[in-house]
Amino acid sequence: MVQCLVVDDDPRILNYIASHLQTEHIDAFTQPSGEAALKLLEKQRVDIAVVDIMMDGMDGFQLCNTLKNDYDIPVIMLTARDALSDKERAFISGTDDYVTKPFEVKELIFRIRAVLRRYNINSNSEMTIGNLTLNQSYLELQVSNKTMTLPNKEFQLLFMLAARPKQIFTREQIIEKIWGYDYEGDERTVDVHIKRLRQRLKKLNATLTIETVRGQGYKVENHV
């Protein structure tokens, strides 16, 4: 079941969204502030976050930035502020979508599912290659009795490569699949994610490795 974090300082909004999410078989974890949301994430995995902008303490822009950079969680901003400058700031903060109040909760649910589809590459939740098992539902890697949870983007990148062993993916193909057509950042972010994945695979003693194909891109090899 999808786990959705909802952050708003209005308890009526929290209850309204949570009740409708439950009817759509989406688990809702409601929090009244950015600080409380981050505390929850220390012990609870979520798949997506719906975040209000106007909150005391940590506002929605700050929370969105933290969720994207530290947890790699897709974010939808929900707010009464509909000025173009606010929308621009929201997308600069990293939000994946933006919904203004008042809103139709069914539209919010449609948008939640649409964002999740962009983040999910393969409907198969589990895959094994060599001694490594990848569980997409929990973003986990497992080798024997060792288990490791990855940030969403790292996991989806590895899952995509592992699903097609020996196939070479260019940086452009990876960005298009993992970050989307509208990504405007540096393509070298792919190299950073690959470096982290190599470190994680080495730590797990996985037989899977990510190889660099000079001048072309990256591919996965399984050394059994």
UniProtKB/Swiss-Prot annotation:
Phosphorylated by HssS. Residues 3-116 form the Response regulatory domain. It is found in: Cytoplasm. GO terms for molecular function: phosphorelay response regulator activity; transcription cis-regulatory region binding. Keywords: Activator, Cytoplasm, DNA-binding, Phosphoprotein, Transcription, Transcription regulation, Two-component regulatory system, Virulence. Gene3D superfamilies: 3.40.50.2300, 6.10.250.690, Winged helix-like DNA-binding domain superfamily/Winged helix DNA-binding domain (1.10.10.10). It comes from the Bacteria. The keyword Transcription applies. GO terms for cellular component: cytosol; protein-DNA complex. Its main location: cytoplasm. PROSITE patterns: OMPR_PHOB, RESPONSE_REGULATORY. Residues 124-222 bind DNA. InterPro entries: CheY-like_superfamily (IPR011006), OmpR/PhoB-type_DNA-bd (IPR001867), Sig_transdc_resp-reg_receiver (IPR001789), WalR-like (IPR039420), WH-like_DNA-bd_sf (IPR036388). The modification 4-aspartylphosphate is found at residue 52. This is Heme response regulator HssR. It comes from Staphylococcus aureus (strain MRSA252).
